[in-house]
Amino acid sequence: MREAAERRQQLELEHEQALAILNAKQQEIQLLQQSKVRELEEKCRVQSEQFNLLSRDLEKFRQHAGSIDLLGSNSVALLDVPLAPGKPFSQYMNGLATSIHKGHEGPTGHYSVIGDYIPLSGDKLESPCVKPSFLLRSSSPRCRFESEMDDDRSSNKSKHSSSGKVHLCVARYSYNPFDGPNENPEAELPLTAGKYLYVYGDMDEDGFYEGELLDGQRGLVPSNFVDFIQDNESRFAGTLGSEQDQNFLNHSGISLERDSILHLHSPTQVDSGITDNGGGTLDVNIDDIGEDIVPYPRKITLIKQLAKSVIVGWEPPAVPPGWGTVSSYNVLVDKETRMSLALGRRTKALIEKLNTAACTYRISVQCVTSRGNSDELQCTLLVGKDVVVAPSQLRVDNITQISAQLSWLPTNSNYSHIIFLNEEELDIVKAARYKYQFFNLRPNMAYKVKVLAQPHQMPWQLPLEQREKDEACVEFSTLPAGPPAPPQDVTVQAGATTASVQVSWKPPALTPTGLSNGANVTGYGVYAKGQRVAEVIAPTANGAAVELVRLRSLEAKAVSVRTLSAQGESMDSALAAIPPDLLVPPAPHPRTAPPPKPLTSDMDTKDLGPHVKVDESWEQSRPPGPAHGHMLEPPDMHSTGPGRRSPSPSRILPQPQGAPVSTTVAKAMAREAAQRVAETSKLEKRSLFLEQSSAGPYANSDEEDGYASPEVKRRGTSVDDFLKGSELGQQPHCCHGDEYHTESSRGSDLSDIMEEDEEELYSEMQLEDGGRRRPSGTSHNALKILGNSALMGRGDRMEHVSRRYSHSGGGPQRHRPMAPSIDEYTGRDHLSPDFYDESETDPGAEELPARIFVALFDYDPLTMSPNPDAAEEELPFKEGQIIKVYGDKDADGFYRGETCARLGLIPCNMVSEIHADDEEMMDQLLRQGFLPLNTPVEKIERSRRSGRGHSVPTRRMVALYDYDPRESSPNVDVEAELLFCTGDIITVFGEIDEDGFYYGELNGQKGLVPSNFLEEVPDDVEVHLSDAPPHYSHDPPMRTKAKRVSQPP
């Protein structure tokens, strides 16, 4: 009690100490939070002061309109800008474009607004002085770079700022810098697929651009994530986009020469009290001083309107240094040139011979330059009768499923326009713009567009009713969702391996939701001669590997790519030619089979008969130590003897826990369990079982079938048959690895065939008219050795087996290397036929009748085969490919076959035979080269099961150990295995697979059972399992194509 009390006091003391520490930490956290709040409040106060200062500057700018005059005899337009002492004038001009985006960073880290370069009044250069004014975009938290950025980052920024090259881009993919590999993700911009952004200057050495999002965020942009939006036939210059935040520079649109387009990015709002596109502020934009657009006159003004004439004035354009030469102005009336004024004269014109009282005229002014004329609609106005503020001739063109282009004729190019879509304000279009591009619309939907004109100043010369008419409407409907657009720029190059080519393309433009023409893009398909040869399921994929074997089988010279979607496929892209050198098949390599190496065993070979030997190299590769009755040692997969091939690596069974069970005890357990089940079985069910057993398809095969030498006699499927070895000539059940299954390009419909034991497929070819084996020149049966010391002393069974296999006569006997089996260490008292080899490839195999097989999986010997000479000896193939096979498979489990005029070896566990109805059908399959993509598995299975009159036999096994796959199994797919307890009677269907597992049934549940946990029920004990029929005639369920592995206990 005393110790308990002391312990309690100690715990209470520790609890109090922990509470004290917790309180101290909480107080520290609160102090940190309060400090952060105070810091944020201070920043907010500073920003508010700067905002007020900027507002006062803007008021001054509204009162004093800036102007830009043309100076110099070289006809080079220069800005009328007050110069700072010691600062070259060219530096102002070169930095003007990017200063709008980035600004010249002042001493406090803020950005200079364009007002730094705007004169307040006067038409002549004043004394050099400049009053700095800084702009902080408070509503955009990342509108400027942090002051902590390194010097390299700042130098890159300065370099791009001075270049003046601005480009509009669209993000091809979404990108989160914090998920990327770079060490400074805060210096990069997050991207959203389909969104627009601006990049400055050239790409740096790391492949990044200096960029800015439409909300003002700036940072690095990976070049492979963006596409430039620029028409080679159009003059392009990007402008900043107007946003919902308090950006005081109005950014909007793309202006194209004679075809200006404003792109819709997102619903935006601009405070009309701040943004003024009229005469109150200098309307300077990137397109005004860009290199790719013809500068246009600004701010056309109606100075005087008379009955027969009008006087108009304008301001000269802003021409970047080195852009070109502006020679004169053209004054047009209704697109007809009335006069031409030389550059340097007064920017005013008197236009006569007009009837303004009865007619309406459109007056326009354009620049004549060495690089073409400017757009007349960027400097235009209407005069005369019935002039209203609203725009006219609204049109919607280029309507697609998700986009449309709106255009109009402005009453005055100084007016800005507000765009409404379905009565919701969408965006503001700046002055001198008359087109707008809608994106992200919904397919097959009606829209109503309203354009509201906003004059830069009230047109008092117009009557009230004409001033009030300030809007125009138009309606349109988008197209129904249709096929997506095809990919572009398709090319074919050499692939990663010699057996494939790489097809690359540029995906079509997608919306942020992954739509193309309103269709939900799911992937891309590669086609050759109208047949799909490859498919990739990824909306943003830009390439796929295509196996050359398919292209050669189709004799294709070019490929095309289609965009796949839920609404169908697109049209074919432009054909891409396949380089001829890639289509040339490699020269065939004749196979020289190495002589088989005799096998030895630790058993006395005299007990096994004259034809039974064990591979010495296999025995040498075994780890040291005794082998017990049901203990299993993993074989060494790296010590395969010379001359042997490995269709697929072996797998290892789980190990029983506890002491090993001796053979005597195992027999006793099996007998006791069998007798216990037999006593509890009902007589009626036992009678039914006996009737079904006696009526089985193999019951009387001994009496019905005779054997001619040297053929091996086929017996009924009794338990003794399976204890001594199968005589049905069945092909081993080969389980395929996950790598074969997952690489299937068509969902592996064909791979479902492998769920049927492959020995059944082979036996239906080998057995004729009641169970005879097809005649062959030699006897190809071979015995798999159970090289276990526990088999010593069972010479009677070994001798019996030896006698059976020395039964043949009248012809030469062929001996083959014995394939080492997992059962070699299990101490089982029956010999599994899973590794029996049916034949060896004869030198004249091509002279035998050809058989048609279909590939169940993709197979590339270079990457998938464990054999060193795979590239020369083995053939690659694709799932569904038709293969011509000569003869039976050899001792290593390989067929000799032909694909694309090349002979080589084919692993038996990767193909399945097809039974053609006649020669014409066989020729058709060979010409086609591949099974059609839509061939149902049921049709193939019916074909291969036709003529088969036997079912998979069943046997009874007793469990020697408890087995819970969730605890004892080292495999991933534990749900595929059965749970059982010691003494349970399990019905086993067919033979053991090469992994060492049976397919069995217990209490109505079916699954895989490790063979080293089971013991055969003795033949002299009659057992009837009421829930298991004597012959299992149904296909086992799909097995997960995963290699089974285990760890030693």
Swiss-Prot record:
Residues covered by region (Disordered): 580-664, 694-714, 728-750, 1024-1049
Positions with biased composition (Basic and acidic residues): 603-616, 735-746
All residue ranges annotated as the SH3 domain in the record: 164-231, 848-916, 952-1019
Main location: membrane
Family matches, as PANTHER family: RIM BINDING PROTEIN-RELATED (PTHR14234), RIMS-BINDING PROTEIN 2 (PTHR14234:SF18)
Protein name in the entry: RIMS-binding protein 2
Organism for this UniProt entry: Rattus norvegicus
GO molecular function, one term: structural constituent of presynaptic active zone
Domain notes: The SH3 domains mediate binding to a proline-rich motif in RIMS1, RIMS2, CACNA1D and CACNA1B.
InterPro entries from the UniProt entry: FN3_dom (IPR003961), FN3_sf (IPR036116), Ig-like_fold (IPR013783), RIM-BP_SH3_2 (IPR035753), RIM-BP_SH3_3 (IPR035755), RIMBP1/2/3 (IPR040325), SH3-like_dom_sf (IPR036028), SH3_domain (IPR001452)
Subcellular locations according to the entry: Cell membrane; Synapse
Gene Ontology BP annotations: neuromuscular synaptic transmission; regulation of calcium-dependent activation of synaptic vesicle fusion; regulation of presynaptic membrane potential
Family of this protein: Belongs to the RIMBP family.
Biased composition (Low complexity): 641-651
Keyword check for Cell membrane: yes
The entry's keywords: Cell membrane, Membrane, Phosphoprotein, Repeat, SH3 domain, Synapse
